[in-house]
Amino acid sequence: MKWIEIKIKTTEEACDAISYMLTSIGAGGVAIEDPNEIRRETQKSNSIDYVDDEFLNSLGEDVVVKAYFPGETNVPELVSLIKEKLAFIGTFLNVGEGYCGYAEMDEEDWSNSWKKYYKPLHLTDRLIVKPSWENYDNKDGEIIIEMNPGMAFGTGTHETTKMCAVLLDKYVKDGCRVIDVGCGTGILSIIASKLGAAEVTAVDIDEVAVKVAKENLELNKVDNVRVFKGVLDDIEKEKRDIVVANIIANVIMDISSRVPYYLKKDGLFIASGIIKERKQEVLDECLRKGFECVEIIEMGEWVAIVLRCLDSL
């Protein structure tokens, strides 16, 4: 199958919003190449691979977002739509250089090339995410999450996902009920299940993500997660203990008025995908919607907020 690869150079603060936009207009897959993230990862004391300074210096500063659309797509119409969407995102985020062109490629060329960069990774002291094609000798007490990301977002390497993993590790209790909004590959749903959640309901607007999530659930032998294409409003309004959303600031603020319909009193809303510059804006909006701030953590340029639901609706 042929694919159209769209290339966009942007900034770290705008890459998630752009990725979300590309998925919403029909991208079959989105890849983010963030040189700043690579530098941070390779400079950690527990980094798995050695990377020389010359390579790090060659990375540049731009974040590159690549999106893949079916080969029969009308490219001029697609490019026009993307430029229009980027202009809108540019009204509230610095999108950087923006659209940089497109190329045609075979599915095999892009669906497998990134695998050499995806290695086992510690999300927390006991949570390990590893690609399905890599071996890993787990130690006592470690929880292994196997992933085959395919064309969906969410491998565990991005700070926004890591922060969610850290917070789920802290707040998920045996028998609790969880909702995962914008589940991507299903990584957070799998983590919640393996940490003891009795049931997880996961949704994503992307059909590819739902397919990949279901495959990853099977890979991890997880049978208490229900995943389907949709948004928060498509989930039945039953009371849960935790709603986790690793999405973007605008969507978090948008759904914050409806999350209390899905949470018990004192239930937790874990919101990630927030760029630092918008932390206070998101926090203020959620406080106005009846939440209480429990905890805020930061990694790189990103923020995750834990909010307590004071008034279940």
From Swiss-Prot:
Localization per record: Cytoplasm
GO molecular function, one term: protein-lysine N-methyltransferase activity
Methyltransferase in keyword set: yes
GO CC, one annotated term: cytoplasm
Enzyme Commission identifier(s): 2.1.1.-
Chief location category: cytoplasm
Binding site for S-adenosyl-L-methionine: T161, G182, D204, N246
InterPro entries found in the cross-reference section: Ribosomal_L11_MeTrfase_PrmA, Ribosomal_PrmA_MeTrfase, SAM-dependent_MTases_sf
One annotated GO biological process: methylation
Entry-linked SUPFAM superfamilies: S-adenosyl-L-methionine-dependent methyltransferases (SSF53335)
Enzyme type, top EC level: transferase
Catalyzed reactions per annotation: L-lysyl-[protein] + 3 S-adenosyl-L-methionine = N(6),N(6),N(6)-trimethyl-L-lysyl-[protein] + 3 S-adenosyl-L-homocysteine + 3 H(+)
Keywords of this entry: Cytoplasm, Methyltransferase, S-adenosyl-L-methionine, Transferase
HAMAP family (UniProt xref): Methyltr_PrmA
Protein task: Methylates ribosomal protein L11.
Family, similarity comment: Belongs to the methyltransferase superfamily. PrmA family.
PANTHER family xrefs: ELECTRON TRANSFER FLAVOPROTEIN BETA SUBUNIT LYSINE METHYLTRANSFERASE (PTHR43648:SF1)
Protein name: Ribosomal protein L11 methyltransferase
